[in-house]
Amino acid sequence: MKRTIIILLFVSLFVTFVLSQIPDNDPELCQQRIQREDCPQTPVPWGTFNDNDEIEVYYMQAPVFEAVFGNFFGKLGGYHSAIGFYDLTTGLNYTAEYDAFFEVGNGTLPNIINVDGKDELLWCNAGILCTVPYINETYWDKNIYSTASKTYMGTINGTQLNQYIEWMQQYNISNPVYQTWDVWNNYGQDLFVPSTTCDDFTQQSIEHLGSIGINYNCSTVFKRDYINLFTEKPQPIDFTEHYDDIFKFYEAVLEIKEGSIAQIIERILSIIGLKKYIYVQGEYYLLELNYPFMNAKYDYITLPGCPANGIDYENGNFIHLN
């Protein structure tokens, strides 16, 4: 219960960002509070690399919400991640990362807005691949944020990087929605809904680079975040039939941040008696949560070609919804 309350308090931080960026009845409903110039609608392809370019690959992590909280969430294992490329031949550097286009809060929870006198749920949960021809050395610098890191993963050539660029642009097309939650029956084994976050992109980048020839040192520590829900198989429902219960649930979650700590805890506990829902690819699903209900993990990932020491994505029983 204590860990569940901590996770819900963490979610309430997301809620703060959600509610503060949407003015009441604003006709331009989904707007980025801060426009990321390095997150264009179409990712920068970086051009074509010479076949013999020597390029070092790095797995980069920095604490989430670092501008406000510094290292706080990094100490709890809460990170944003990206892949960095250092072209030793040309001296140029590149970053590839995936993010919520309208910020993480909107990728996690809806906004409740009034349309013609009726409350509606507005989701602004687009995901976007951000690619820039540089590496922000300050953001990923452990001398500035002690929990930040850049981990050398291996070296590739220009041909392999060109292949990766094609793959990452297809990833952007195939993953248009940011999904915060991994929805499991049993952690690491039975997965109903996979998340689509920065960590999923970096993990799949590492896997794809392995498939096109990078050789990993199996002693390299490769870890990532998971924000997990635990449930029996989610059941698809009709939105109109469940309208009232869906609104009660999301209103309760969105109100968590209001009031004193005691009131916040009271609101968290009040959610226990409500029906729980999740929104996946345009559909709502009813959840029957099971123990431990929800948690966050900073866990190992097995590198391609190495002995399993974390979640085995090749051999796991990934059930999914369909």
Swiss-Prot record:
A Pfam family this chain is assigned to: CLN5
GO terms assigned for molecular function: hydrolase activity, acting on glycosyl bonds
Entry GO CC: cell cortex; contractile vacuole; endoplasmic reticulum; extracellular region; lysosomal membrane; perinuclear region of cytoplasm
Sugar-modified residues: N93, N106, N136, N157, N172, N217
Xref: InterPro entries: CLN5
Signal peptide as annotated in the record: 1-20
Key words of the record: Glycoprotein, Signal
GO BP, one annotated term: cell adhesion
Family of the protein in this entry: Belongs to the CLN5 family.
PANTHER family: CEROID-LIPOFUSCINOSIS NEURONAL PROTEIN 5, CEROID-LIPOFUSCINOSIS, NEURONAL 5
Protein name: Ceroid-lipofuscinosis neuronal protein 5 homolog
Source organism phylogeny: Eukaryota, Amoebozoa, Evosea, Eumycetozoa, Dictyostelia
